[in-house]
Amino acid sequence: MKERLKNFHHSAVFICLILAIVLDVVLEALGRHSLFKAVEYVWDQPLIFLYNCSIIFFTLTLSLLMRKRIFGYCVISFAWLILGITNCIVLGFRITPFSAIDMLMARNTITIIDKYFDVWQIVLIAALLFVALAGVIILFIKSPTVTGNIYRTRTTVFIVATFFCVMLFTKIALNAQTISDNFANLATAYNNYGFVYCFSNSVVDVGIGQPSDYSEDKMLEIKDDLDS
């Protein structure tokens, strides 16, 4: 029995790995509006592609703590696909790719959504979101449950180790200038470094930090100097 559970755990990790690779190819195809360009990117930038896969892989490993692992795989994969599809749609209206700041501005986006979509398109999007939500609920109910010991402590250690590996890969890639965390042009960065890394970076880095000497009086002083 222990051997079977061990083999299942290993197969679960393998599933996470395969899903990560497939998801990254799909996300790049959506962002580039071309499967051919996505494959070309994988061929030209294999290390960056694998690095992006490692980020997705880490998120998928969280499902290993769940007894309903298939549900976990699907929800996490669905979340990435939603981000990728949103990026694909956004790039149809503007040059700048989808980033975390857009999510923070979601309330403002709702007020102007009619400027970008027709009524039938808005209704279709709402219907698709409803179907997706219903699908998630049904999947949770119907998906099989892992029985027996899922080794939470060992699995948690593995997930934490995976996280630190991703952080280490990031540090090495930055030092080697394989990737950059300073995006002069967001569209170029997404094209060169991949959607997953760039979007993840936008979650962590939401803009320029506030200077230590910043204050309202300081801003008024600068304004007076400019006006004089």
Regions found by a protein language model. Name each.
Residues 2-190:
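Transmembrane and membrane-interface helices of multi-pass
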Residues 173-228:
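Soluble catalytic regions of membrane-associated enzymes that act on cell-envelope
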